[in-house]
Amino acid sequence: MAQNGYLVPADPSAVVTVKKKTPQASWALIDATGQSEPLDVDKYEIMHRVQIHARDLRILDPNLSYPSTILGRERAIVLNLEHIKAIITSEEVLLRDPSDENVIPVVEELRRRLPVGNASHNGGQGDGKEIAGAQNDGDTGDEDESPFEFRALEVALEAICSFLAARTAELETAAYPALDELTSKISSRNLDRVRKLKSAMTRLTARVQKVRDELEQLLDDDDDMADLYLSRKLSSASSPISSIGEPNWYTTSPTIGSKISRASRASLATVHGDENDVEELEMLLEAYFMQIDSTLNRLTTLREYIDDTEDYINIQLDNHRNQLIQLELVLSSGTVCLSMYSLVAGIFGMNIPYTWNDGHGYMFKYVVGLTGTLCVVVFVIIMSYARYKGLVGS
């Protein structure tokens, strides 16, 4: 700023203050043990950490509008489902905007359910119980063989399906009474209320439809589902090393084998399995596809109910319009008859001298009576003809 003709340099501390207020991406990191920690890092650190491209990370930008997407990459799953924006790897989950009120329950659910596959790390610490745990491990090891990324994906799908189902239930609770009230009493307030509910239903239907379409697209393509098997791809990359060390673990030290987590055993098993086998993921996606499809069916039923209500209201309005037209016909017919009466009165009321106007005062009542009778007869004829043609009284 110029003062007395001199340039005054800007305050450098003010510039530093502005730089400190630059917003950074907010993330939450949840590992396989269920521990979570906040991460305030930029997009380049995220890209380097999970090895994804910038275009994939751009999908998770809350300032940009992207449809619901589930992308499988080499070492990560990019998940964009409404407010749930996450990056899932074979060992951890990066969740966007963890302080959002809709995301906080997802974080808590991830912390609760992700450590299930690693529960065997905490067992077998007694002196004589370790070998027994190793022997019984074969019986309990098959209870939860889902890889880490599938458990995280299941939490996200369950959260978004439950969220959309809850929004649908709220909409149904408000919509059905409003529609019933509108059918009984058509008013501007009720019409505006139903209009807002219909707009909300249209937006919610579009959101549910996007999630359903994404799940359907995944189920239709086995290659896309195979890309989501991160543990299998990671195990396949390290299979030569694993195949050498694996026999010694089980033959020499059963106690070490008892400490191997279920997720690790599942990863080792997939090394020798069919890489095109996507049955486990297909069953997982089908369950939530049916759930989201049920939500969409509820919205479709609500839309049909709204359409039926609109048709009923239109029928009522058409009926009222027909009644108004009938009333207009009656009034028009009466006006024609009165105009005939006025015509006679106007003829006799003209100020024109004629001889037979004198000495015939007794004719006034006959003229009035005959003219009125003629008008009534004409009105009855018009209304009878209209009723015969079905224009009135139907």
Swiss-Prot record:
Expression across tissues: Expressed in the whole plant but preferentially in the mature anthers.
Q: Has UniProt tagged this entry with the keyword Magnesium?
A: yes
Sorted keywords for this record are: Ion transport, Magnesium, Membrane, Transmembrane, Transmembrane helix, Transport
Q: What membrane topology is annotated for this entry? A: Multi-pass membrane protein
Please describe what this protein does: Low-affinity magnesium transporter that mediates the influx of magnesium. Plays a crucial role in male gametophyte development and male fertility.
Describe the family membership recorded for this protein in Swiss-Prot or TrEMBL.
Belongs to the CorA metal ion transporter (MIT) (TC 1.A.35.5) family.
Which organism does this record belong to?
Arabidopsis thaliana
- Gene encoding the protein: MRS2-2
> Which InterPro entries would you find in this protein's record?
CorA_TM1_TM2, MgTranspt_CorA/ZnTranspt_ZntB, MRS2-like
Instruction: Give one GO biological process term.
Output: pollen development
Cellular localisation: Membrane
Q: Where is this region: Disordered?
A: 115-145
> What else is on record for this protein?
Has the ability to complement mutants in Salmonella enterica and yeast lacking magnesium transport capability.
Q: Which SUPFAM superfamilies match?
A: Magnesium transport protein CorA, transmembrane region
Q: Name one GO molecular function term.
A: magnesium ion transmembrane transporter activity
Q: What is this protein called?
A: Magnesium transporter MRS2-2
